[in-house]
Regions:
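N-terminal small/polar loop signature for handling phosphorylated ligands or for N-terminal nucleophile
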Residues: 1-20, 29, 132-143
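Short glycine-rich anion-binding loops that position phosphate/pyrophosphate groups of nucleotides
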Residues: 2-5, 43-45, 250
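Short glycine/serine/threonine-rich phosphate/pyrophosphate-binding segments
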Residues: 4-11, 47-50, 164, 168, ...
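A glycine/threonine-rich phosphate-anchoring loop and its flanking beta-alpha core
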Residues: 15-114, 208
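Active-site segments that bind and position negatively charged phosphate/pyrophosphate groups
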Residues: 104, 108-231
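C-terminal charged capping/lid subdomain of soluble metabolic enzymes
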Residues: 216-288
Length: 288
């Protein structure tokens, strides 16, 4: 399956050896002993085939949380399994892949040249293959690049020695829990608000991202950042995805609920650990 199936299987593998409600494992965030599992990937996005994480939704309480356990023993990646995917699922998978990289890249400048270049390589690849993948999902070479990009985006390869963000993902998880939006679709909306609100904090990386990925080199720093954020949003638009909450009929009621959930849990995300309930509200308001 894809991320949802694999992640659910990871919870089953942990729950089989747990004496209690498997939801306890999710709330703890860490599994103990697990039954070994293998995966055959049929939807590329989450990297679950080569990482130890899993994200689980509980529909009756509208909650969505991550936990960590063992890696799959092995995974089979055959691009031909992607041939039957609807174009929207491909678009959401590409968005998820892209934002996975940004969560590890768009943080603190000057930490690792190698991590930056690896991350930029995946970003460039996704930008280049996205139109081809959406035009012809049966193009073996293109779907191979897509499948491997999604795996490498979240298999711990590009995070070595660098700070990470994940605020966009945590806010996106709440949107999925509350509105059943596909995960990648939530990221295509929230990432733009994150970059707008935290532009000063992310200034150095935004300038680097704009130059190296979007070719933005002219104008003042502020103008370059504006154009970079605009290019970022335009990319998700090119996938056919919404980039504003209002396009999905989401407004103040949801923003207030997400702010409340962040505050109630005491959650703080971002490379500076400054995305709390109030900051999550600002980010969401910037997505309206």
């Amino acid at each position: 399956g894809g991320g949802s199936v694999i992640d659910g299987t990871k919870l089953i593998a942990a729950g089989l050896l747990y004496d209690g409600d498997a939801w306890d494992i999710v709330l703890k965030g860490q599994a103990g002993k697990t039954v070994p599992l293998a995966t055959v990937l049929t939807m590329s996005a989450t990297g679950s085939e080569m990482n130890s994480g899993a994200v689980i939704s509980r529909y009756e309480t509208k909650e969505k949380y991550a936990f960590y356990g063992d890696y799959p023993v092995f995974s089979i990646l055959d691009p031909e399994t992607l041939y039957s995917l609807p174009k929207r699922q491909i678009a959401c998978g590409l968005a998820d892949t892209f934002v996975h990289v940004l969560e590890q890249y768009m943080t603190t400048p000057g930490q690792s040249r190698l991590m930056d270049r690896w991350a930029e390589g995946i970003l460039h690849t996704v930008v280049e293959i996205a139109p081809k993948a959406l035009a012809d999902e049966r193009d073996y070479d293109t779907m191979s690049e897509y499948m491997l990009s999604a795996t490498l985006a979240l298999n711990d390869m590009i995070r070595m020695g660098v700070t990470q963000d994940w605020a966009t993902h945590m806010i996106g998880h709440e949107l999925t829990a509350l509105h059943s939006l596909t995960h990648g679709a939530t990221l295509a909306i929230v990432i733009n608000g994150t970059l707008r609100v935290l532009r000063e904090q992310k200034r150095g990386k935004l300038l680097q991202y704009g130059e190296r990925i979007w070719g933005v080199t002219e104008g003042s720093d502020e103008e370059r950042i504006d154009r970079t954020i605009a290019a970022n949003e335009a990319f998700f638009r090119s996938l056919g995805l919404s980039t504003r909450l209002s396009e999905e009929g989401i407004g103040e009621q949801t923003i207030a609920e997400i702010e409340h959930r962040f505050n109630a849990a005491g959650d703080r995300f971002g490379e500076a650990q400054n995305v709390d309930g109030a900051m999550a509200r600002r980010i969401l308001e910037a997505c309206l």
